[in-house]
From Swiss-Prot:
GO molecular function annotation: 2-C-methyl-D-erythritol 2,4-cyclodiphosphate synthase activity; metal ion binding
Protein name per UniProt: 2-C-methyl-D-erythritol 2,4-cyclodiphosphate synthase
Subunit structure of this chain's protein: Homotrimer.
Naturally occurring in which organism (per UniProt): Leptospira borgpetersenii serovar Hardjo-bovis (strain JB197)
Broad class of enzyme this protein falls into: lyase
Site residues (Transition state stabilizer), renumbered to this chain: H37, T136
C-alpha cells in the first residue's frame, strides 16, 4: 500500500542577528531569520506535516502546539523525529521527498546541496530520493515583498510487508 502526503509551511522573515535561519536542518548564513515558536524550519515542518497527512494523523500543531511554552524554540529535527517514529510504528517507510521553497530571499541555489545532504541524513534516504527546488512569486504578494518564505512538500510512503 502506498500513501501520498502534502505539507505546506510559511513563516515571516525578520532581521535578527541573534536567531539563525534554519532550512532543512541546516543553519544558513543570512541577515534574516524566520519567526516562529520553534526554530521555524519551514522545510522540516512541511515534511513532518506531509508524513502526518499521509498517515491521516493530523498535523504538527496537534503534537507540538505553539501555545506550549515548553516547546519554545524547539529544534524542528525533534518534530521530524517524532513524525518518523509515528510512521515506523505503523510499519511505513519513506520512499521519496520533493520540496519546493518559495520566496525571493534568501536565495536557495547556493544552499540546496547542504540542505539536500541534511535531509538525506535525517530521513535516511539516498540522494536520488530527495529533491529540493526553489522558485519565487515574481515579486508578487507578501513573499514577493520578502516578508516571508514558504515550502510545499510531497512525500510517498510505502507499507512494509
Amino acid at each position: 500500500m502506498y500513501r501520498i502526503g502534502n505539507g505546506i509551511d510559511f513563516h515571516r522573515l525578520e532581521i535578527n542577528p541573534n536567531r539563525p535561519l534554519v532550512l532543512g536542518g541546516v543553519e544558513c548564513e543570512s541577515e534574516v531569520a524566520l519567526v516562529g515558536h520553534s526554530d521555524a524550519d519551514i522545510i522540516l515542518h512541511a515534511i513532518s506535516d506531509a508524513i502526518l497527512g499521509a498517515l491521516a494523523l493530523g498535523d504538527i500543531g496537534q503534537y507540538f502546539p505553539d501555545t506550549d511554552p515548553k516547546l519554545k524554540n524547539i529544534d524542528s529535527k525533534i518534530i521530524l523525529a517524532k513524525c518518523l517514529e509515528l510512521m515506523k510504528e505503523r510499519n511505513f517507510q519513506l520512499v521519496n521527498v520533493d520540496c519546493t521553497v518559495i520566496g525571493e530571499k534568501p536565495k536557495i541555489a547556493p544552499l540546496k546541496e547542504k540542505i539536500k545532504k541534511s535531509l538525506c541524513s535525517l530521513l535516511d534516504l539516498p540522494v536520488d530520493c530527495v529533491s529540493v527546488k526553489a522558485t519565487t512569486t515574481e515579486k508578487m504578494g507578501a513573499l514577493g515583498r520578502q516578508e516571508g518564505i514558504g515550502t510545499f512538500c510531497t512525500i510517498l510512503l510505502v507499507k512494509n510487508l
